[in-house]
Amino acid sequence: MLRTVLEPYVGSPQRLLDVGSADGPSVGWLSAPHKVSLDLDPRGLRPPAGICGSVLALPFADASFEVVGAFDVVEHCDPEDVALDELARVLEPGGRLLLSVPAYQWAWSGHDVANGHHRRYTRPRAVAAVERAGFDVVRATYGFTAVFPAFAAERALRGVQHRFGLGGPEGPADVVDLPPVRPGIEKALLGLCRLDRRALARRDLPFGSSVFLAAVKR
């Protein structure tokens, strides 16, 4: 789904930075002759192109890259504006920022806490934050729309359980590791995601559990 929305804005860069997803969803399609992957966690990083570091203090000179990808990264960063300013700093003028963030603060749960999130976003909130950092947003849309009813129901159930003390306390494994999905359910969810991909190839979607955004540095 990320690829459907954001790959058209990659172009043919020579210098590209992939922040926070050394072994993540962008490995197969976000590429360049000189690609650098940066992550706080050294696992999955392969020197010399894999660098351990923080988006709050990127170890690169100004205007080092033509494209920067940051998928499910900015929600981990506090202060948010420092992270976005750093992403802007290492991009050359006219460079492209591609990012994704989780949607809707009302969907906040122990999963967010355990994974080190500081916030969730609406589309307007994500657009405003990126524009303040000196970008012009060229596309911003929600994703995972077809599976959103199931996502919303699961988060509502978590909220009720937490409020009334049902289901016992959440341990780290409960909130970080996703529970196994039955093959039939997994097949249905993948089918719904394929519907999203087809729709996103033609238009933006009005709601979903993630926000996908492409922007150009002024």
Q: What are these language model-derived features?
A:
Residues M1-A63, V67-F71, V82-L84, P179, ...:
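Conserved N-terminal segment of class I S-adenosyl-L-methionine
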Residues D72-H76:
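A short His-aromatic
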Residues C77-D81, V101:
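A structural helix-start
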Residues D81-R96:
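A short glycine-rich, Lys/Arg-flanked "PGG" loop and its adjoining helix->strand segment in the class I
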Residues L97-R119, R123-A128:
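Short, glycine-/aromatic-enriched active-site segment of Class I SAM-dependent methyltransferases
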Residues F135-T145:
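Conserved S-adenosyl-L-methionine
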Residues V147-R218:
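A C-terminal cap/extension of S-adenosyl-L-methionine-dependent methyltransferases
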